[in-house]
């Protein structure tokens, strides 16, 4: 594919708006269609971002022959339905994180995409961030030795009162899928899938997690990760990776960092950035890095991204399932 990558946006919420804004900065890519449950919402979004076509149903977007790839920006509970609809119509898909409600749904999507030879990627934008990519290079090159501990947290406060989607089990509410997916994905980027999962949580009257603490373990590597997520506590949102020869610290906003600091015995602290890091342009939020990766993969004829591999997304979903099992959170879609 040498021509412009033509995007469709499925859903019109806040993250969809951020996506459309950031895509404006990416040469060779454009949003050509948007869909919502209502035509009114779709038209308003289209007018706001100068999108030529607006649909009041998802099927029309999936059937649009001038759309190459669809960005699924619905709540978690609709990820499987929306992504499957687009894949079955022959569209490539970038699906928001958390990938799905559970590992079973994720496995269904991955099988569908692989069977049809279509591109599918979870929108774990952190993996595409140039600063995070620089960190992973250093760790894999042995800059801090063998990784022994990872610490990361992501907590915010609302208001997220009764009636908010984050309090609704049917919508995959709670801290874990919205925020906990970041520290879990961060740890698994470095260490892979854990073989031990412990967790404790504060649950809401509706049965979703308000605050969850996780301890993940990797027996063979001799490593562990202490992770927290919350929708009732404003945590530092920092991350730290400690190895046998040093430590890497990320300041607040580890999921989209401007820099990190490498500490090694006998050396002065070293600060690392990367070209295009941080805001990466006035008014941008950082989604342009995952957008660029999708465009690169499509032009190369790839059906999976090496930066956000599907097997990695499946492994994260299995960990999230295990955490929910430990803390007693179930969604209606779990059956």
Predicted regions and their residues:
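N-terminal Rossmann-like dinucleotide-binding module
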Residues: 1-49, 329
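Hydrophobic residues in well-ordered beta-strands that form the structural core
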Residues: 55, 95, 120-122, 250
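Contiguous beta-strand/loop segments that form the cofactor/metal-binding neighborhood of enzyme cores
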Residues: 1, 185-257, 286, 294-300
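Predominantly a Rossmann-like dinucleotide-binding segment in NAD(P)-dependent oxidoreductases
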Residues: 126-198
